Amino acid sequence: MQKPQYIDRITKKKVIEPIFYEKTMLFLYNSKLGKKLSVFLSTHPIFSRIYGWLQRCSWTRRQIRPFMNRYKISEKELTKPVADFTSFNDFFTRKLKPEARPIVGGKEVFITPVDGRYLVYPNVSEFDKFIVKSKAFSLPKLLGDHELTKLYAHGSIVFARLAPFDYHRFHFPCDCLPQKTRCVNGALFSVHPLAVKDNFILFCENKRTVTVLETEQFGNVLYLEVGAMNVGSIVQTFSPNQTYAKGDEKGFFAFGGSTVILLFLPNAIRFDNDLLKNSRMGFETRCLMGQSLGRSQREEI
């Protein structure tokens, strides 16, 4: 079976994505028994809570150094020495030095809010044209709000998928006034490409949070964090109804893989050309937090 590939934004080369717990993932999503087991585990949150508790135990510290070596995670980016982490989950939710993720300036520039693999689509209503095998993607089901669905039905959408070895804090992508976050309860299906490749509706069924960002340059932007298998915890560290600057921390995911989804009103943003090109070819683009995602179309009117 062909392994997932993405395009690295810096090198512009295709990269074969390493599969976290490869044998387990292949069993869960490429066998009949595995698929049934994955549904059972994902719809019973007790398993995710137990797994999360285990990753908070002090003995998991021994996993950190081998994990960093395997996935080439730089210790120089960390705000504290590896020896100071109290558990694997403590390392998983690590903070980085500001210089490790420089922020692109300009109020008209919307930045990538997380380290992850990005897909961008200028029009939500055309989304199915790009997803060949996927089960139906449902915006009403994703948002759980009829009024928001009407507003964003012809807007733009971004998927940013995080792998377990990525930096797992998420940030504000522009200057904004965030409203109170709303939680939409759901299961915790994996968002690994092996799981999602034929089933984008998983994003509409997983536990997720929705925050409206009031912005001057981009109108109201919807910012969603989607939980995944072994990620029962989406932690918001911001205070609603207070202004935040581009690049400020919004929150973090506890252990596992996860996804951020952004929704824009029609004609609010023009995505960068490389992201558009790669998405149209069916390739995710690996970006680092703080890079340019697109520009406000208000500047062009």
Curated annotation (Swiss-Prot):
<keyword id="KW-0472">Membrane</keyword>
<keyword id="KW-0594">Phospholipid biosynthesis</keyword>
<comment type="pathway">
    <text>Phospholipid metabolism; phosphatidylethanolamine biosynthesis; phosphatidylethanolamine from CDP-diacylglycerol: step 2/2.</text>
</comment>
<dbReference type="InterPro" id="IPR033179">
    <property type="entry name" value="PSD_type2_pro"/>
</dbReference>
<feature type="active site" description="Schiff-base intermediate with substrate; via pyruvic acid; for decarboxylase activity">
    <location>
        <position position="258"/>
    </location>
</feature>
<feature type="active site" description="Charge relay system; for autoendoproteolytic cleavage activity">
    <location>
        <position position="171"/>
    </location>
</feature>
<dbReference type="InterPro" id="IPR033177">
    <property type="entry name" value="PSD-B"/>
</dbReference>
<comment type="subunit">
    <text>Heterodimer of a large membrane-associated beta subunit and a small pyruvoyl-containing alpha subunit.</text>
</comment>
<keyword id="KW-0443">Lipid metabolism</keyword>
<feature type="active site" description="Charge relay system; for autoendoproteolytic cleavage activity">
    <location>
        <position position="258"/>
    </location>
</feature>
<keyword id="KW-0444">Lipid biosynthesis</keyword>
<feature type="modified residue" description="Pyruvic acid (Ser); by autocatalysis">
    <location>
        <position position="258"/>
    </location>
</feature>
<feature type="active site" description="Charge relay system; for autoendoproteolytic cleavage activity">
    <location>
        <position position="115"/>
    </location>
</feature>
<dbReference type="Pfam" id="PF02666">
    <property type="entry name" value="PS_Dcarbxylase"/>
</dbReference>
<keyword id="KW-0865">Zymogen</keyword>
<dbReference type="InterPro" id="IPR003817">
    <property type="entry name" value="PS_Dcarbxylase"/>
</dbReference>
<comment type="function">
    <text>Catalyzes the formation of phosphatidylethanolamine (PtdEtn) from phosphatidylserine (PtdSer).</text>
</comment>
<keyword id="KW-0670">Pyruvate</keyword>
<keyword id="KW-0456">Lyase</keyword>
<keyword id="KW-0210">Decarboxylase</keyword>
<dbReference type="GO" id="GO:0005886">
    <property type="term" value="C:plasma membrane"/>
</dbReference>
<comment type="similarity">
    <text>Belongs to the phosphatidylserine decarboxylase family. PSD-B subfamily. Prokaryotic type II sub-subfamily.</text>
</comment>
<keyword id="KW-1003">Cell membrane</keyword>
<protein>
    <recommendedName>
        <fullName>Phosphatidylserine decarboxylase proenzyme</fullName>
        <ecNumber>4.1.1.65</ecNumber>
    </recommendedName>
</protein>
<feature type="site" description="Cleavage (non-hydrolytic); by autocatalysis">
    <location>
        <begin position="257"/>
        <end position="258"/>
    </location>
</feature>
<dbReference type="GO" id="GO:0004609">
    <property type="term" value="F:phosphatidylserine decarboxylase activity"/>
</dbReference>
<keyword id="KW-1208">Phospholipid metabolism</keyword>
<dbReference type="GO" id="GO:0006646">
    <property type="term" value="P:phosphatidylethanolamine biosynthetic process"/>
</dbReference>
